């Protein structure tokens, strides 16, 4: 019975021929390590060798470095200070310096015991510098303002010793903190008054009167510019926008009533909103300036006061003036919504009413009658002055131009017997 697995049976076959291995391949050849080259023995140097052939002495090794600093001291203490820094001491020098300390300021660097070389020269340098600075200040305590007192004090005591002694600089100047003596002096008129110190005194500002004419006005009594006060009764965002714009008086024979009041584009094109009508109305009743002719056109330039109104007494509007505007010149295909977009930004706007009438001619376009209602006559006058000669489409040369006037009940037409039924 064959106990071999089926897998082993499938692998059965003719045995391969045995490999022929040469006997040399079993040998492992290990090369010996390379021996270092033997140095050639040099002949012994004789004492008769010339000194020029000897090696140069090695350079000095810097164990530490000290940043160069400037130490201010008296000439009599210079030798003592050098000996303290270099580590050399002398009892005779110490005694001579102590005897001369009665007539000159005492140097605390002599009190530092560094004669035995127990500390490094760098540490000795730092201790000595700190002691000298504290001693030089002495009783002259008070910061940067007292440096001059110390300087003049030493010049008065020893003028013969300090002739070649420069003025000490106790503060090392830098980029962010320059010394007090390196800064130029400030002229008295360098700073100017920005505002009044006392509100009641009213010190004048240093602002030219013509620089900010749109925001400041000149007081006639004291010549003090101040903010423009909004005293108008029609106070709204749109009215303030109108007041901020500059007023141009452009009289034109082709313009309708109240031309020249608002802001007119050059070349007789659309009439942009201007601040004048909102500013010329004193109260809700409204008024017109005396510069206007009976037909509503401007006669010239009027002098404005601090709030932009003419300096002359304005004429009030007629008492029976209507708060409804009659608008002519609308296209025949315009809608009520389009007309409302024109008048909605104005203060006091209520509604727009359109009446369409058929043309008398068969091929003619229908006529559109437009009536715009406002809260009062002053609001209606503001819109009238702003939209007079308004062009509906600037790109079209034959575009319609709006003609606005106050609406009134028309009387009997010529040739009619009675009134309108």
UniProtKB/Swiss-Prot annotation:
Every RRM domain range:
323-409
Region Disordered, as annotated, extends over: 1-64, 86-114, 197-226
Q: Example GO molecular function term? A: RNA binding
Outcome of gene disruption: No visible phenotype. Nsra and nsrb double mutants are less sensitive to auxin.
Q: Where is the composition biased (Pro residues)?
A: 33-44
Does Plastid count among this protein's keywords? no
Q: In which tissues is it expressed?
A: Isoform 1: Expressed in root meristems, lateral root primordia, root vascular tissues and cotyledon vascular tissues. Isoform 2: Expressed in root meristems, lateral root primordia and root vascular tissues.
Query: Its domain of life?
Result: Eukaryota
**What triggers or suppresses the expression of this protein?**
Up-regulated by auxin treatment.
Keyword field: Nucleus, RNA-binding
This protein's GO CC annotations: nuclear speck
State the InterPro entries in the record: Nucleotide-bd_a/b_plait_sf (IPR012677), RBD_domain_sf (IPR035979), RRM_dom (IPR000504), VQ (IPR008889)
Q: Which Gene3D superfamilies match?
A: 3.30.70.330
What ranges does the record list as Low complexity composition bias?
89-103
Task: List the subcellular locations.
Answer: Nucleus speckle
> What this chain does, per the record?
Alternative splicing (AS) regulator that binds to specific mRNAs and modulates auxin effects on the transcriptome. Displaced from its targets upon binding to AS competitor long non-coding RNA (ASCO-RNA).
Please report the name of this protein according to its UniProt entry: Nuclear speckle RNA-binding protein B
């Amino acid at each position: 019975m064959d106990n071999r697995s089926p897998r082993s049976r499938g692998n059965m076959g003719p045995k391969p021929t045995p490999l022929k291995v040469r006997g040399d391949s079993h040998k492992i050849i290990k090369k010996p390590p390379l021996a270092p080259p033997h140095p050639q023995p040099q002949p012994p140097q004789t004492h008769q060798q010339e000194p020029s052939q000897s090696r140069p002495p090695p350079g000095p090794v810097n164990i530490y470095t000290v940043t160069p600093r400037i130490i201010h001291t008296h000439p009599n203490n210079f030798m003592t200070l050098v000996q303290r820094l270099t580590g050399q001491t002398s009892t005779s020098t110490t005694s001579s310096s102590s005897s001369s300390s009665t007539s000159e300021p005492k140097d605390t660097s002599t009190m530092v015991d560094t004669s035995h070389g127990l500390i490094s020269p760098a540490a000795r340098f730092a201790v000595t510098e700190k002691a000298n600075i504290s001693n030089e200040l002495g009783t002259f305590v008070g910061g940067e303002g007292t440096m001059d007192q110390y300087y003049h004090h030493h010049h008065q005591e020893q003028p013969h010793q300090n002739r070649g002694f420069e003025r000490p600089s106790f503060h090392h100047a830098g980029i962010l903190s320059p010394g007090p003596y390196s800064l130029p002096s400030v002229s008295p008129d360098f700073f100017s008054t920005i505002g009044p110190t006392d509100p009641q005194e009213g010190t004048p500002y240093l602002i030219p009167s013509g620089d900010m004419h749109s925001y400041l006005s000149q007081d006639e009594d004291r010549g003090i510019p101040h903010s423009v006060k909004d005293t108008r009764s029609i106070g709204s965002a749109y009215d303030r926008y109108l007041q901020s714009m500059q007023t141009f008086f452009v009289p034109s024979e082709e313009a309708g009533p109240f031309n020249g009041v608002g802001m007119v584009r050059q070349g007789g094109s659309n009439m942009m909103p201007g601040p004048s009508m909102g500013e010329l109305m004193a109260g809700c009743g409204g008024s017109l300036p005396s510069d206007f002719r009976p037909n509503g056109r401007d006669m010239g330039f009027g002098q404005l006061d601090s709030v932009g109104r003419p300096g002359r007494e304005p004429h009030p509007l007629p008492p029976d003036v209507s708060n409804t505007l009659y608008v002519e010149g609308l296209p025949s295909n315009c809608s009520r919504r389009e007309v409302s977009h024109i008048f909605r930004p104005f203060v006091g706007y209520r509604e727009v009413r359109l009446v369409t009438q058929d043309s008398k001619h068969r091929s003619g376009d229908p006529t559109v009658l437009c009536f715009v209602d406002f809260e009062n006559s002053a609001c209606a006058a503001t819109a009238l002055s702003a939209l007079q000669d308004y062009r509906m489409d600037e790109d079209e040369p034959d575009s319609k131009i709006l003609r606005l006037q106050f609406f009134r009940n028309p009387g009997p037409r010529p040739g009619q017997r009675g009134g309108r039924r």
